[in-house]
From Swiss-Prot:
The gene is janQ. It comes from the Eukaryota. This is Cytochrome P450 monooxygenase janQ. The lineage of its organism: Eukaryota, Fungi, Dikarya, Ascomycota, Pezizomycotina. SUPFAM superfamilies: Cytochrome P450. Its cofactor is heme. Pathway: Secondary metabolite biosynthesis.
Length: 501
């Protein structure tokens, strides 16, 4: 009780201090000091509607909203967004926002602010190396990836009967994504280790819950609170397992890089020897687990919910998947890339259920002045609107109507299908960010989601539970979550044409 009182007093003091960081843009919510308090208290439940209101009123410029911890500034003007999104961390830091939101100093030290760590561009280089392997003749990586998915499906679903099977989308989806993430990051034998899968699946959910709790307390109490949270314990355990595996691999002379962890070790030894330690590498891998699993699973769950409640898409998408598999002799990378309608359906599911109402989150690490004269003080949190843009009639006709072929048609009409793929970003589609900090793992996420949806479409009929509609989304601050206990019903199809399972 004493700790709670101290935390409350500290939060109120921190809130008052943070509101002193003033930016001269219109405010959304109630006026005056009391009004700011009321708006801040509404943030947890009404953040998305407040951001929508700001966008509708000031979508040509910018606005600010009082939250329990600070003013949050939303930049709507495209020219201003371009000004800040590509700036280096000495002016606007993306990592500082993540570090504060999830308290990564304790929950994910490999992503903490102000520590020596593997830089994101190097991790992106590793992911690019892995992605390129899929198109190299004779490279077995993608076949191994498919094999790992089929193994994960069998282990995690255990569907043996022909009758209806209730499939818990979030729980089972998280664990299957954990298998594939482990395959990518640390490879065999760890990706088949039950403890690793448990840790990967649990860590993806523990980071935000632990981070939100730790953030409620003043700095002097954070280390104590962290000792009672799950994420720091899981992070430490993963670090120790990865470090042991890395040391064992170093004893095996002549082994080539086969996963992200081993690639980082080889690359740093060859190009920057002595700059990064083994601990730096394993901590970067552990930190990557959260980002790789958390958002991928949420998009996957939305896709499953939408597919189960929109039966008109099932047969056309099934035919496209079947044709691609037959044309390429099984699950091949080229075949998955040819599934343009399925890719469009996934992107529309993501557009229709946007994870975050804001994007391009940055913290000003120094005072900054935009070219139009707007001054932003050091410590200011800046965002670009995301959800409001995705439902803006100017960019997406009939935005409140789900259209699974929306992006497929746009690709055909413009003659530029690549610009409308699930992984594509632009100023009106910021789900993966844009600029310097565009999500480097989005290609792997696309493969995971397409594999799982394609497998389900080929092998199962998919519906909702009887007399139940789509499991409802829920909201916390700016974030939209799918129903984590929601289920769909799968039933094995009577006739399934041959495919490598």
């Amino acid at each position: 009780m004493v700790l709670g009182l101290l935390a409350f007093i500290w939060l109120m003091r921190a809130w008052r201090q943070s509101l002193k960081i003033w930016v001269d843009v219109p405010s959304i919510g109630k006026d005056g000091i009391l009004g700011q308090w009321i708006t801040a208290l509404q943030w947890q439940q009404k953040a998305r509607s407040l951001i929508q209101e700001g966008y509708e009123k000031h979508g040509h410029y910018a606005f600010k909203i009082a939250t329990p911890s600070r003013w949050e500034i939303f930049i709507c003007n495209e020219k201003m967004i371009k000004e800040y999104k590509n700036l280096m961390d000495d002016k606007f830091s993306a990592n500082a926002v993540t570090a504060d939101m999830f308290q990564t100093k304790w929950t994910a030290p490999g992503a903490a602010e102000g520590v020596h760590k593997i830089p994101i561009p190097l991790l992106a280089k590793a992911l690019t190396w892995q992605r390129n392997r899929s198109s190299v003749t004779g490279d077995t990586y993608f076949k191994e990836f498919v094999t790992e998915f089929l193994h994960a499906w069998e282990v995690e679903t255990k569907i043996t009967s022909e009758g209806p099977y209730e499939f818990c989308c979030f729980e089972t989806g998280t664990r299957i994504v954990a298998h594939l993430t482990a395959k990518s990051l640390v490879g065999h034998p760890l990706c088949r280790d039950p403890e690793i899968i448990d840790l990967f699946a649990g860590y993806g959910n523990a980071v935000p819950s632990s981070g939100f709790l730790i953030a409620m307390f003043p700095g002097i109490l954070k280390p104590l609170v962290a000792k009672f949270c799950e994420a720091p314990k899981m992070s430490d355990r993963l670090d120790r397992i990865f470090l042991s595996e890395m040391k064992e691999r170093q004893l095996q002379t002549g082994s080539d890089a086969s996963d992200i962890m081993s690639w980082l070790w080889h690359w740093t030894q060859e190009n920057e020897p002595g700059k990064y330690s083994e601990v730096d590498i394993v901590r970067s891998i552990t930190s990557a687990v959260f980002g790789a699993i958390h958002t991928t699973t949420q998009v996957l769950v939305h896709c499953l919910f939408e597919l189960a409640t929109r039966p008109e898409y099932v047969e056309p998408l099934r035919q496209e998947v079947q044709q691609a598999v037959e044309n390429h002799g099984g699950w091949e990378k080229e075949g998955i890339e040819s599934m343009l309608k399925l890719d469009s359906f996934i992107k529309e599911c993501q557009r229709f259920n946007p994870l975050d109402s804001g994007s391009l989150a940055r913290c000003a690490t120094n005072d900054f002045t935009f070219s139009n004269g707007l001054k932003v003080a050091k410590g200011t949190y800046v965002f670009a609107p995301n959800a409001p843009v995705l439902f803006d009639e100017r960019f997406y006709p009939n935005p409140h109507q789900f259209d699974g072929y929306r992006f497929y048609r746009l690709g055909q009409q413009t003659g530029k299908p690549q610009g409308f793929r699930f992984v594509a970003t632009n100023s009106n589609y910021l789900q993966f960010g844009d600029g310097r900090h565009t999500c480097p793992g989005r290609y792997m996420a696309a493969d995971e989601i397409r594999l799982m949806l394609g497998h389900i479409l080929l092998h199962y009929d998919i519906t909702t539970k009887e007399n139940e509609g789509r499991p409802k989304n829920w909201f916390f601050k700016k974030i939209l979550f799918p129903d984590m206990k929601g289920v769909i019903v799968l039933k094995k199809r009577a006739e399934v044409r041959a495919v490598n399972k």
